[in-house]
Amino acid sequence: MRVVFLSPRYPPEMRQFTRGLAEVGAEVLGVGDGAPDPELRRYLADYLEVPSIMDEEDVIARVHGWVRGRSIDRVLANWEPLVIVAARLRERFGLPGMSVDAVRGFRDKQLMKDRVAAAGLRVPRAQRVRSVVDVWSALEA
């Protein structure tokens, strides 16, 4: 199984996921914004260093070009800020895993509450605010 793993070196605990994937036989293709040290490198079949792992559009474009011609089985990100970019890559490559829509339901807390309420469960009253004026309006409601 060939796995693209986003940010295998940060946060530090991601190194253990990288090691675990390799130890169970996965071919791990790492993507991150810093060079892997020799200890981590031994668990990576290949590594793509990008200028900023947080630049979604750039990461998607670079990964797309980098894996061209290789079969990929999974795209994983265990660090919460990267789960949407992982979902976008999965959708682009037609791979299994959570979709962008599903992931947004976990990342966007207002959307999460709306979905839980739509399923018939009670949730605390809440609304999205984007400004100080919105905060005061919410408090007065």
What residue ranges belong to the model's regions?
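ATP-binding N-terminal substructure of ATP-dependent carboxylate-amine bond-forming enzymes
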Residues: 1-102, 107, 111, 133
